[in-house]
Amino acid sequence: MRIPRLASPLLLIALALIGGWIAAWLLLPDEVAHLSFLVTIKLGIEVTALCLLLGSFPLYAALRQPKWPKLPHVLVAVSLGSLLIPTIARSLSLSALFSFYGPLATGLRVMRLWPQGQPLDSSHAAVVIALVTLYLPFTLLILSESMPSLGRMPDVAGTLGAGVLQTSLRVTIPRLLRPLATAGLVVFSQVLGVIITPRILGSEDVTLAVLIDDLLKRTMNTPEALRIAWAEMALAIPVAAVAAYFIEKERTARARPLQPALRFRGGRVLSVIPLVILAVVPGALLILSLGHSPILSMASLFQSGPTLEWFRRALLEPGFRRVLLPSFMVWMAAAAFSIFPALLVSVLILPYPQVRRSFRLLALVLLFVPQNALGVLLFMVLSRFPAAQASIPAWLLGGMGQAVPGFAFAFLLMDRVGDRLRRSLALASTLGASAWQRLLKVALPNLAPSVAAAFVATALITLDDIIFVRYLPRLPVNTAATELFGRARYGAAPDLAAACILMALFILLLVACGHIAREFPAIRRRLVASVGRPKVAAELGVEGAR
């Protein structure tokens, strides 16, 4: 009875991986590309295995331990918080940690665990560790949506006499195989297109994404870069499609709350591991970055905090001030080209469940495929129309490119309230509401939180993206992300820590605004309750007033 449940996901994964690998191998032009393909596969497997190992066991232990019931929520909150910090900022902090004179490399050399003359930051181990810290939140978030569906089944199996190994093989692994496979496929697909972290660390590993970047920006070999990009897409699209299919299947799976075990030792200890990786290590790296900041001294930070004078000096830095307006314009363009089409599409396809499902799968695939290969393909499309792209401002082209993942994310956010919105619109139509009333009083209030969240998501994409502005077919627009990436890569001496902190604070401010917009109905109800009911409530009763 258990064999089909195990065989179906494994067969899909095997077909996707083998088919993608064969297609990519045949599309690659030469031996250098084949070697980069092998390096990419090796790096993806290592990062995926470590993310699953460090994410699945601690999260399962946190859900099963009875002492701290809020611990799983803490893990999810820390994972979401770590995703708010741009990848460039996190990579810069990791670069400070892994640098030749950094604390980690110095300590390893003192303990004779690392060769004296060999740098740590450009090593393969540093890249793997850095990518694990970047993609571990994805694993925790995906698994946290599916692990509660186990319910009391592990306890029931133990009560019936099943051992730990037998319970794992017959109960736990079959039920969690699909979410584990989903998390692994998502992480693997993201590693395929990673550029920022290896470049900032100065890695010697030449992956397919790095090879494409070199061909486009150094040797200007556009045809070969396009061919490798097609190979990367052939490798990633089957993986992304299977991951999207598994996520869609998990949406319809029956979920039961995972109750704490009666006796489960070591859960809190295991749960500390991802907390240290996602919370303590970034905090220490932030302090380390501040210590190397030429603008902000540690003494003034602890005495008076990040004062307005510090913000003024950071904002007056010429390079940072020069990219503020282009970054804002790219963000606005990306928000406009992603939110409004997603809003229109999500409303138009509400009565068609199969069309909604197809759009969900397409949006997930667009999010999971490597963004660098997608940027190269958009680069080639724009190159076919030189007159049109010459008349469009560079910031608008960059925003249009970033709108591709932005549209996918915005549509998924709005589709989450699609069923409720469809029922509300049907009820309003039954009660005789006009089309404008249904739009203004039903559709927009239901979609407003999703629109606000999508607005914040486009800000995250803009502040963390270098691909869609770096691969423009003419002189690219310089944004905050490209400025930080260029300075970190080419060894300039700006105040990178100050700029990263400002970016992080700006993102947190946007998230706070989105959270307030989402919770506005509840806040309004609390205000009404605190002020008092109107007089009609006293005359007609609470239910009549409602």
What are these model-predicted stretches?
Residues A33, M153, I195, T222, ...:
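Membrane-helix interface/capping residues of multi-pass secondary transporters
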Residues Q65, M153-L177, L421, L427-L447, ...:
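Short helix-to-coil transition segments within interhelical loops
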Residues L150, Y245-A253, R420-R423, H515-L527:
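Membrane-interface capping segments at transmembrane-helix boundaries
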Residues G158-T159, G163-T167, A253-L262, A299-P306:
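Juxtamembrane inter-helical linkers in multi-pass membrane proteins
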Residues A243-L270:
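Flexible interhelical linker loops that connect adjacent transmembrane helices
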Residues M1-P148, R175-I196, I228-A241, G266-S297, ...:
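Membrane-water interface segments at the C-terminal ends of transmembrane alpha-helices
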Residues V194-T222, M298-S304, D465-A493, V528-V531:
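Glycine-rich helix-loop "coupling/hinge" segments at transmembrane-helix boundaries
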Residues A157-L160, A428-L431, R524-L540:
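Short, highly charged, low-complexity non-transmembrane loops/tails of multi-pass membrane proteins
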